Amino acid sequence: PSGQDGIVGSRPERYPMERDFGGIYTPGVTVFRQNEAKGYGLLAEPFKVGLVTVAAINHPQCVDPTHMTPDCVQGTLNKLRTVLRLALRAGHDSLVLGAFGCGVYDNPATQMAQLFRQVFDEAEFKNKFRLVTFAVLDNGKTTPRNPVGLYQAFANVFGRRD
């Protein structure tokens, strides 16, 4: 094997997740810029965060515009569990999550929010996090897979808190 397969594939002890649903935890990433609304200016006091990286399914197969096939649902659930497991193993009690593939990867947003809710309600994860925030833009954009928009899809499932 060559490339990443040669590194990751031969080192399963470093990446204990299933290969198809694996993820990477990166501790101590320095945040030193402000947000877009502030022109990405430099922060007066940079801070560090831990990052969990798990790839969402790219353009999943769907049984209708807003629902993935059972295989894609199961794969997505496994990926969401990986995100939460990595965060817990690293000792985090607060999360900032994105819409997990509901943008250019075209995952159905309402179903994705429901799948997040389902995983957070599982015994392994229920009440394990002090704070969970979804960083989902309210840009008003809708698509056939996201007829209410990303923000509204997540707000409908989790409620809105500013």
Name the predicted role of every residue range.
Residues 1-95, 99-162:
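Macrodomain-like recognition of ADP-ribose-binding/processing modules
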